Amino acid sequence: MKKRRQLISLLLAAVMASALIGGCGQKTQNTQNSQETQEADTGEAPGEEEKTSDAEWDTGKDDTITLSVINNFYTAGEKKLAEEYMKLHPETKVVVDVVSDNDAYKAKMMTSLDGDRKNAPDIVHGNFVGMALTNNNVGIAVEKGYLYDMTDMLEEENPYNGGKVKDAFTDEDLQLVLSEAGGKYMPWLPFDKIGFALFYNKDLLDEAKVDIPETWEDLQEACEKLKAAGYDVPISAGPESFRLCSTIADAYYRGNTSDILVQPGDALWDESTMSANEDFEFDESNPLCDQFTVFSVERQMKYASENGITTEANKKIYDEFYTVGKYFPDNWIAADSTQAIADFEGQISPLLYQASFNAGMIMNDINALPEDMSFNWGTSQIGEFRDPPEGFGSTLRGYWDFGNIMSIIDTDDADHLARIKDFYKFWYSVDGAKMCFEETLNNGNFVQGPCVIKGVTLDEELEALLAGFVSAPAKEWAWATGMQWSTSADTPKYYDYMNQFTSGKITVDEYLENMETVYQNYNNESIDRAGFDLDPTTADQAKE
């Protein structure tokens, strides 16, 4: 533990001087509905020697690593990685288990990590472990022994990258992982980032004499003008578009950041990793000022339990969201984003709010349109309020965060763990990451966004498109607003209330009143799983 804290402290010190002075999961789209398990080919690469002499495991013993992933996102690349790795290490089979969709994946995590974990995979989407087992708290997933802490692994040599594991990443990105995971552990290493942007059809906007929106007021006015011009759905949106509400919530709540940070005297306090929290006050002139602060989930839950969702703050936030959300299509929150994308590509909707993990597909689709159906298009960030409402900051920060969050399931089998870590290092090397991206794109699969591993770049056109998703990153305030905050049992109710609200069938007061029970049910489940006593100064024990 002392060594781990020393490593984290050194990392934090290297980052803070430059980054803080200079600046303050997800719902994914899947196209298959069945679950499949696939194994890569084990043929040897011509002219390559097996790497066995310096292996940290028993090369005379066969073993299997299982990589469990959600369909379509990097799956082609991951299969290629497995195939090439087995050419180097034929004693280790790598199985790529492809699960059909998000819900099936969460169910798999719950069943496979229950009890003795005999059927548990080895490398998983760590954020989905958090969603399934600890109500989005990845730090607690480490505490409970589900996920392996990679802190010490950062100092290990990566034989596939010519240096230490940490050398593949910027200090800033490693520190962000630490901050987002609760300030104590490294449950994953960064691979890529995702963001959200407004896609626009320039030809249709010009025809309707509408400027490209860049402010919140611009977006409101654009939707109003397009509606008047005859577009039934001026802005196409799918379930991921809830992030637009999160942007509005951040502009309001970030002034309260100091109230929900881990603080000196809290049981979780660690001076070496949380110094950014001390005496913190949000600086509106510096939108990056809070990026290395560490939120206290227990303080969040305490606030949520004491204040509920029917607050004046949330009324203001949802009132603002409604000014654009009322132009969303019917049933947007529960619909498949494929329809929203098709409406934009088919020029039914001039605007689309969408994530970078669909950007490559949209770019390819539009490039493939016949000449008589093609159109000029681009992406834009809605970066500010032109005239901020009372209580809101002027800068609108978007979602810009790590996308493919891959974690290792913890195990006491040292030989097996050494193999898992070695494959992970192979993947998170420059050559491995390039292979994963290139194979994925060549097979028509999605990539989530730009790669953060040093030395990995994409096709120039795709890089230029993805650059439009970069924004000052907002902190996550869904816990305060209730947006996407429901148990599985209550999710249909949440969808119904949200659709009634954005379609104008119920008022904001009625929406919040209806959501109060849904909100508290989720909070109570989160508190129970985490073992919180709602006193941050006392240590808690997460329930098994």
Positions of PLM-derived features:
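Short, low-complexity disordered leader/linker segments with a strong preference
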Residues: 1-66, 87, 527-544
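Hinge/lid segment of periplasmic solute-binding proteins
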Residues: 44-54, 131-195, 211, 264-287, ...
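Short, well-ordered beta-strand elements
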Residues: 60-72, 92-98, 123, 187, ...
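C-terminal capping/gating helix-and-loop segments adjacent to ligand/active sites or protein-protein/ligand interfaces
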Residues: 70, 440, 450, 463-529
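Extracytoplasmic/periplasmic substrate-binding proteins
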Residues: 76-83, 131, 138, 254, ...
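Periplasmic-binding protein-like
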Residues: 77, 424-450
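Extracytoplasmic "Venus flytrap"/periplasmic binding protein-like
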Residues: 84-172, 203-214, 350-351, 368-372, ...
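Glycine-centered hinge/linker elements that transmit conformational signals in sensory
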Residues: 223-225, 262-334
